[in-house]
């Protein structure tokens, strides 16, 4: 019998938006366990050339977000496609409201990080950029489905990550 792999992810940017989560993760997004959490040692900044955020290390700072509990391999693979090559997956410790720490997967900027344009705020992004962003994200994810990744199960990397300590 195959072992069902489930992973927890920390969302700090566009995935805080319910419509984006539903687009990326599918209808199952509504059933995700979402818990308020914060990631210490980072701050959320606006990426220099786009409307999406990234995390920059900063001692004493922390980023508020959501811990999404129990994503399956297919959802994790869709997340990987959504995040693209500008981000890398890392395991970090997040803090829950009651002070407990727990491990979560987080997408961090990869390679040389462009100069940040200041803080990134969800409400501002939703007012200014969300409608156009949703259209582009829908096209990006349609390309993922057309490539057959949904049915071929390109999720081995997820199982490798889940097995790491």
PLM ranges: what are they?
Residues 2-165:
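Glycine-aromatic micro-motifs
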């Amino acid at each position: 019998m195959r072992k069902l792999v489930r992973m927890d992810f920390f969302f700090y940017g566009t995935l805080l938006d319910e419509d984006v989560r539903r687009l990326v993760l599918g209808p199952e997004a509504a059933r995700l366990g979402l818990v308020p959490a914060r990631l210490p040692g980072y701050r959320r900044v606006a990426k220099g050339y786009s409307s999406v955020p990234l995390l920059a290390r900063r001692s004493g700072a922390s980023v508020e977000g959501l811990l999404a509990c129990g994503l399956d391999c297919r959802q994790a693979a869709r997340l990987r496609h959504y995040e693209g090559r500008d981000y890398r997956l890392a395991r970090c410790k997040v803090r829950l409201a009651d002070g407990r720490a727990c491990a979560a997967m987080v997408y961090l900027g990869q390679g040389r990080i462009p100069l940040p344009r200041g803080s990134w705020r969800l409400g501002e992004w939703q007012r200014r950029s969300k409608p156009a962003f949703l259209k582009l994200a829908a096209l990006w994810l349609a390309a993922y489905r057309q490539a057959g990744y949904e049915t071929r199960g390109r999720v081995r990397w997820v199982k490798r990550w889940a097995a790491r300590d």
